[in-house]
Regions:
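N-terminal capping segment at the start of a domain
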Residues: 2-38, 127, 383-385
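Active-site-adjacent substrate-binding region
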Residues: 9, 23-24, 162-212, 250-255, ...
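His/Asp/Glu-rich mid-to-C-terminal helical/loop segments that flank catalytic regions of hydrolases
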Residues: 214, 230, 234-259, 306, ...
């Protein structure tokens, strides 16, 4: 279906304005940060709910704090094709990661009448994808997929509030969480539009990309422990400097990642006791490790563990590790991926660019309960998780039309009713 350009332009203007509006809802006055089960979470979802209703959807908040909108299909109660993304952010975030996908989904839903499709159409604004507050990602989508881990209830935020307590403070009942779970027979599939968060579409001079798979990721909390001492009085041959050991390990992360074709990042590091004239006795730091294939990711980790053992042997240190997150790689469903590809082709791009997603997405969790596929949208210089995150309205327009066409491609294979 070819859309009137003026109509699409007006829809895109509205999407961009709404991204700006959501970006004003932040827990910090100087930058964008919006986390799970916070007042800002509620305020953002109240806005999203109004926009869903304006697009003709019935709405509710599920038992995990996700906001859901639904348009019925040819008859009430049909299985639903889910469209969605997330509304939470990292600290000092951009305004398009997650939010653009939610707003595109709402706009697409607004292009359909109740009863028009052979399935219901639902838009889900996931409450927690980033894991910023409690350190574990994909909580919103894991709840919907029925893969919730009850050990999470004991997780705490920076203020010592447990996830269990935060649920209650938000007005949710932890005992009712299973009410968010979906069954496979209730769903047709899941489609997500998202900024690429990488430079590959820009390098290829393409607006849109076809996601083939989502990287498998593991995250670790790591510790090197040595012995603190006087910076002036302790000779080098007697030092057990935890920071020097950790620094050597960080360099090894870069080297091993390049060697294996994985992506390893140390994004957080704390030094103790932290005195300017004290040899560091302990270093606590993070490791984010991801790859297109789990076997490659795991081989990289095995190599890094061996590196850590060698560092400890040479420097008189001990190494501690705790895995805090694991998500295996997920392949996009061939049928739904072809629907996305046909949507891209409908915009004039006859040979869609296939890309594997280096970033994690809610689809990783949703794949446990229903097939998934994703559409990538070019972002300026591949920048994401940063205030400079940027998209072009023309690319958003192409994404909107392609996403609608993908829904219609799925519908074309099913009878109405």
């Amino acid at each position: 279906m070819r859309r009137d350009r003026d109509v699409t332009a007006a829809e895109v203007d509205l999407i961009m304005t709404r991204c700006d509006e959501l970006a004003t809802i932040s827990s910090h006055p100087d930058y964008l940060e919006r986390v799970h089960l916070s007042p800002e979470h509620r305020a953002a979802h109240d806005l999203v709910e109004g926009w869903m209703q304006g697009a003709g959807m019935s709405t509710w908040m599920d038992a995990a704090g996700n906001r859901v909108g639904r348009i019925e299909g040819g008859s009430p109660g049909l299985p639903a094709l889910l469209l969605g993304s997330h509304t939470d952010t990292v600290p000092d975030a951009g305004r398009y990661d997650g939010m653009l996908g939610v707003l595109l989904a709402i706009a697409v839903a607004g292009r359909f009448r109740p009863g028009e499709l052979p399935f219901a159409l639902e838009v889900v604004a996931f409450s927690d994808e980033e894991g910023t507050r409690f350190g574990t990602a994909l909580m919103g989508s894991r709840a919907l997929a029925g893969t919730w881990d009850d050990d999470w209830w004991r997780l705490t935020d920076a203020d010592g509030i447990t996830l269990f307590e935060a649920f209650q403070d938000f007005g949710l009942d932890p005992a009712r969480l299973p009410g968010a779970f979906r069954r496979p027979e209730q769903l047709v599939g899941y489609l997500e539009a998202h900024i690429e968060q990488g430079p590959y579409l820009q390098d290829a001079d393409r607006r849109l990309g076809l996601v083939t798979s989502i990287a498998g990721a593991r995250r670790f909390a790591l510790t090197f422990t040595g012995h603190a001492g006087h910076a002036g009085g302790t000779p080098f041959d007697r030092r057990r400097d935890a920071l020097v050991g950790a620094s050597e390990f960080v360099i090894a992360v870069e080297a091993a990642s390049k060697n294996h074709g994985t992506i390893g990042t140390v994004g957080k590091l704390e030094v103790f006791p932290g005195g300017v004239n004290v040899i560091p006795g302990r270093v606590e730091f993070s490791l984010d490790l991801r790859a297109e294939h789990d076997v490659i990711r795991d081989a990289t980790w095995a190599e890094l563990e061996a590196v850590a053992v060698d560092i400890c042997r040479r420097r008189g240190l001990t190494f501690g590790t705790r895995e805090i997150y694991r998500a295996d790689a997920v392949a996009c469903d061939p049928f739904l991926a072809e629907a996305i590809a046909s949507g891209i082709r409908s915009t004039g791009d006859v040979d869609p660019v296939p890309l594997w997603s280096r970033a994690g997405h809610d689809g990783m969790a949703i794949a446990a309960v229903t097939p998934i596929a994703m559409l990538f949208i070019r972002c300026l210089d591949g920048i994401s998780h940063h205030p400079d995150e940027s998209v072009q309205p023309a690319d958003v327009a192409a994404a909107l039309d392609a996403f609608e066409a993908a829904v219609r491609a799925v519908a074309a294979t099913l009878p109405v009713g």
